[in-house]
C-alpha cells in the first residue's frame, strides 16, 4: 500500500515541464514489460516442456514394449503349458483306470497357476504404466514451477540494479523536499 501511495505522489510531482505527470512512455509501463516476460517464458518454455514430454513419452513407450515382450513370453509359456497339458491328457487316458482324479487335479493346478501368472503380469503392467504417468506429470509440474520461479527471480534481479535504485531514491528525496517547502 505504501508503494502505491508513493507511486501516485511520484506521478503528481513529475518534474516535467508543467504536464500532469502521467508516464506516456509505453516501453516503461508494466503491461508491456509483463507481456514481453510472459511471451519469452512461453516461447522458450514451450520447447523445454515439449522435449521433456517427448522424453517421458519414449520412456513410457519403452515400458509398454517391455511389458508386451513379457506378455509374449508368458503367452509362449502358456502354449508350452497347453502342450504339456495335452501330454498330461494323453497320459490321463492311459492311466484313467488308476488315477483319473489325480490327473484332473494336476490339470486344474496347472491352469490356475498359468492364469494367476497372467493376471499378475497384467496387473504389474497396469501399475507400472500408472506410476510412470504419475511420475511424468509430477516432473513436468516441478519443471514448470522451477522455470517460473527462475524467470521471476531473473526479472526481479534485472529490474533491481543500482542505477534504478539511486534514481528512485533521488526522486523520492526531491518529492519530500518539495513537500517540506510547501509547508
Curated annotation (Swiss-Prot):
Keywords: ATP synthesis, ATP-binding, CF(0), Chloroplast, Hydrogen ion transport, Ion transport, Membrane, Nucleotide-binding, Plastid, Thylakoid, Transmembrane, Transmembrane helix, Transport. In plastids the F-type ATPase is also known as CF(1)CF(0). F(1)F(0) ATP synthase produces ATP from ADP in the presence of a proton or sodium gradient. F-type ATPases consist of two structural domains, F(1) containing the extramembraneous catalytic core and F(0) containing the membrane proton channel, linked together by a central stalk and a peripheral stalk. During catalysis, ATP synthesis in the catalytic domain of F(1) is coupled via a rotary mechanism of the central stalk subunits to proton translocation. One of its GO terms (cellular component) is chloroplast thylakoid membrane. It is found in: Plastid, Chloroplast thylakoid membrane. F-type ATPases have 2 components, F(1) - the catalytic core - and F(0) - the membrane proton channel. F(1) has five subunits: alpha(3), beta(3), gamma(1), delta(1), epsilon(1). F(0) has four main subunits: a(1), b(1), b'(1) and c(10-14). The alpha and beta chains form an alternating ring which encloses part of the gamma chain. F(1) is attached to F(0) by a central stalk formed by the gamma and epsilon chains, while a peripheral stalk is formed by the delta, b and b' chains. InterPro entries: ATP_synth_b/b'su_bac/chlpt. GO terms for molecular function: ATP binding; proton-transporting ATP synthase activity, rotational mechanism. It is a single-pass membrane protein. Belongs to the ATPase B chain family. This is ATP synthase subunit b, chloroplastic. Signal peptide: none annotated. It comes from the Eukaryota. The chain crosses the membrane at residues 27-49.
